[in-house]
Amino acid sequence: MKLTTQRIDPDLVRQVTILATIIGSIVINTISNFFPPDGVDMATLSDRLFPSVQILPANYAFAIWAPIYLGLIAFGIYQAQPTQRHNPSLQRGGYLLVFACISQCAWIYLFLARLFPLSVVAMLGILLPLIVLYQRLEIGQHHVSPTEQWFIQIPISIYLGWITVAIVVNAALALYSINWGGWGITPAIWAVIAIVVSAAITTLVTIEHHDPAYLLVIIWALIAIGIRHLDTPLITVTAAVAAIFLILLSVDAPKPVGKDS
């Protein structure tokens, strides 16, 4: 009598793993916000330890995590459907989102543990997989169905947009934590440099991908930076000009071409 073994579909494993990792990362983030170590959440910790870091956005900006996690839940549920098991776009994405979510959990622990330089490494662990995933999904480069746009592309665009800003802020906090002198350049000037670099990166992404979701997240962050630092006109004006420029750029950016995928 022969024993037969049924091969598990690797795409099914991927679907389950992605959904489980998304749920796990949201649970960990929620616990860290409502029951943080020592009763100090991330926003409060940043305010207490980094009052002089002038690239920090206003606290309301962190509400962006609500649509980020809502989008990830939508992504997780959508990709887990049997009809999406062999979706070429999702197959190309592989386990990249899993790596990003795991790194997100690591970042939360490291930041709350005040291991700020190591938290930058974890943030890179979020950013790099998201960049590769963004490229593999070819977001904004081809027309796709509205369903795929809302449940696959937009969640990744919003997540990547915020992490693009967050890693700049995180790096600034890490440097401050080790008493980096800034090479004699004032914090306000460094903030302006960071804003300009962020706007330049966003310009390149917008020209190549014409991705309104990514663009709006950056604009949201720039406005929040300007509002937090109203007492420093140089930062506020630079952030406002950068935001206006990106808004105008979004109007003239090239539209995606190609067949539906």
Regions found by a protein language model. Give the residues of each.
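Internal transmembrane alpha-helix with an interfacial aromatic "cap," most often the third helix
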Residues: I73-Q91, V98-V120, L124-P146
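Alpha-helical transmembrane segments of multi-pass membrane proteins
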Residues: I22-V40
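Membrane-interface capping segments at transmembrane-helix boundaries
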Residues: P10, Q81-P82, Q135-H142, S250-S261
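Central hydrophobic cores of alpha-helical transmembrane segments
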Residues: A213-A224
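N-terminal membrane topogenic signal
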Residues: Q6-L19, W65
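Alpha-helical transmembrane segments of multi-pass integral membrane proteins
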Residues: A20-I28, L96-I108, M123-Q135, I152-N170
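Short aromatic-rich membrane-water interface segments that cap or initiate transmembrane helices
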Residues: R48-I64, Q149-S157, W180-A191, H229
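Membrane-interface helix caps and helix-loop-helix hairpins in membrane proteins
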Residues: A106-V120, I178-I185, L204-H209, H229-L234
